[in-house]
Structure formats: C-alpha cells, structure tokens
Amino acid sequence: MFSDPDEIPNPEKIKDFNLVCKYGIFLQNKYTYKLNLFNKYESPWEGTRICKKKDLKSIDWLRHSTLMKNLKYSFWRVDKEKNIQIINNGGWHFNYLLNPSEISKKFKSLAETSWDKEEFYNEENIKK
C-alpha cells in the first residue's frame, strides 16, 4: 500500500481489497485548507494505491499508471493497466492545511483572477 503523507486510507476498507485484482485505488474525500472544509470539486480523490508485492513494479509506476480512467479504455489497449479495483469511501485527503495568514498569502499569490477578491484572502473571513 502506498499513500502520500496527506492521504489517510480508511482502515475499514483495507480488508475490502480483492486479491484477485492486481491493483486497488482508494477514492478519498478531499479537504482543503481546513479539516472540515470539504472540496466537492476535487472529490473523490484517487488517493492511496494498494497491490500485492509481486505486482509492484515501482512506486512511481503505481502512482502514475494505475488510474481510474484506465478502466474506460478498450480491451485492445494492452498498454493500459485495467485490472484495478475501485474502493469507494476509501479515506481522506487533506490538502493545504495552513493557518489563516498562510491561507491568505496563498490566495493572494494565485494566478487565477477569480480568487483575487478581498473576501477570499481576508483573514477574519478565513477564521470563520
């Protein structure tokens, strides 16, 4: 099992990995900036990966080649791994957990102009 430090797999779901499948992807709820700020736009997050040791080619290969979109490719795309189990409700991914002043600084530095409004980087609003 491989996971980034900010990805926490649901321990209840680890036992759901079917050993007939080579690989598993835990679909995780994503939280951004605060522990209770659910990010519905990037959830579910393709987070933690799991496989048997004999099927592990490399950690990088596991992260970059076992993707949910592979399941949509036709059977003749033998270059795409398709023996993947999707594990729903697979845990939590926490992104950019920062204090209010750091969140404000991050919003001010974003290139995206839609976030360039006082309401988004005002520290008092962030504290709410």
Language model features with spans:
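Charged phosphate-binding loop/patch that engages nucleotide di/tri-phosphates or the phosphate backbone
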Residues: 121-128
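Conserved catalytic core of nucleotide-sugar-dependent glycosyltransferases
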Residues: 7-121
